Amino acid sequence: MKNKATPIDIETLVDESLLVFIASDDVQDTLQGVRRGIEREMLRVTPSAQLSHRPHPKSLGSALTHPYITTDFSEAQLELVTPAVTGRKETFKKLASLHHFVATHLPEGESMWAASMPPSLPLDSDIAIANYGTSNVGMAKMRYREGLANRYGKRMQLISGIHYNFSLPKPFWQMLHANTESQLPLEDFISERYFHLIRNVLRNGWIIPYLFGASPAADKSYLRDKPYQLLQLDSTTDYLPWATSLRLSNLGYGSSEQSRFPISFNSKQDYLIGLCKALTQPSVQYSYLAEHQQLNGSVLQLENELYGSIRPKIVNAQMRPLVAMCHYGVEYIELRSLDNNPLLPLGIDELQSQFIDLFLLYSALSPSPEISKQERTLIMQRQELVATQGRKPNLMLPTLNGEVLLTDLAKPLMNLLAKMATIMDGGQNTNGYEKAVMREQAKFDTSQLTPSAQILSVMEQENLNFTTLMKSYSDEHQQGYLSDTLSDDEMTQLQMLAYNSLLEQKQLEAGNEENFDEYLAQKRHINCEMPSRADAALSMQRYSMQFQDNKEPANQL
């Protein structure tokens, strides 16, 4: 682990010393404590594959206060959230249970849209922003979404995906801390190592859209009035023949204004300085908007507005993330670059989860130099090339060493992941990791096995447009959700959560102690220079009382 790596060789580096570290029985024991959680966004659609105009069903509870079933940008955009637990099977069982519960409580005829790219969309004026009621916290969430709509348009916000939350246990970090002979205090070491992980994910993150991208096509209504040159499969479907993920491309989720303020992941300090600047710097593009049209006129209204494929995260309901991370560090990462795979009932499966865990563990252990401006540009270029042309034969990707064949760039990483998989399976008496790597390696050997290729193949062979095929998958999965069963205890628990969340929202609405303008004025205040943890807790005490939201981080808007 003490080998030095220079930026010039990082993209092809194979560091065998990490294999020695993870092969230890003690380290294998700690890895049983890896926690993961999944958040899946999906649109509610009508039998004719139109965006639902109905409100979020009350039978699902309050979108404001329910811990597992909420909404994202739109009233018709569900978000299902599993708690972070150590058991992978438990995570997927919970995710399946949430799908079943939602399916049984949707308005008649509605289903959950299986794809990341939305179906045929109405005009922006006919897309309803999520409604969170009349409490101050609820109205703030709605004002934030008004800001998103006015800044980026509503259609972009309706792109859905999967967020994968991942944390390594403290005993693992303690062993790595000793192994690397780090002079940093343990808590600082953990935070910096999460940024270390993030940098490696950024470097090698192009493999995510290649392997798991599932949005090579979109309904024509999404690109209405946008100057992008896509091919037409038919009069309703735009696509790119070699694309893996339009969602992750420049025509998907992104912000030109944010690109003017690139935030560094070279250290916790660099990240927080950049984030604070974006939260306090008046935006050239958005300052003209009226107060009621957004939370504020900064480049970022809130931390959550920061777009990117991966984020450092901390859960602390007592203070906003900027301050909490400043004083308590990073607790976990959120991988945000996963498309909903419409070929899978849950949009993701356990083998994919095992591969992602391996990739993230590799990223935490492999050398990770700072990312220069030059390398950051190359990372963005690789991402765009793979998102729009990833399956193109003999595609060359730019690196610090010049252009490299995509499959050649993948080889050292996949070889090392295969070795890690053997060690992990041996230590945990399974064979899932090796199966996961073999399945993904096959996609590099044969690009037709990627989900993006499979989707386009079905469209072309069966002469189906995007919306028709995705509606077919959605209906098929809906029948599967309905045929699943929950135990009486599970169903009762979910029904009680829904009921209690509605009560909690009413209590919040009855407890407004100040007018909304005063509430927002407090929310706009950011102190980026709090000198101590005690001062941070004291300064944020009032903030905490105002913004606690569903026992989640106060800023989860």
What role is predicted for each listed range?
Residues 2-149, 156-162, 189-192, 196:
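Terminal catalytic/cofactor-binding subdomain
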Residues 24, 138-154, 158, 167-327, ...:
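Loop-rich catalytic cores of soluble enzymes, especially ATP-dependent carboxylate-amine ligases
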Residues 37, 93, 97, 139, ...:
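Generic recognition of stable, solvent-exposed alpha-helical segments in well-folded globular domains
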Residues 53-56, 92, 125-126, 176-177, ...:
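Short conserved micro-motifs at the rims of enzyme active sites and ligand-binding pockets
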Residues 326-328, 333-421:
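Substrate-recognition/cap regions that form aromatic- and gly/pro-loop-enriched pockets
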Residues 429-557:
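Extended, compositionally biased alpha-helical segments that mediate assembly or anchoring
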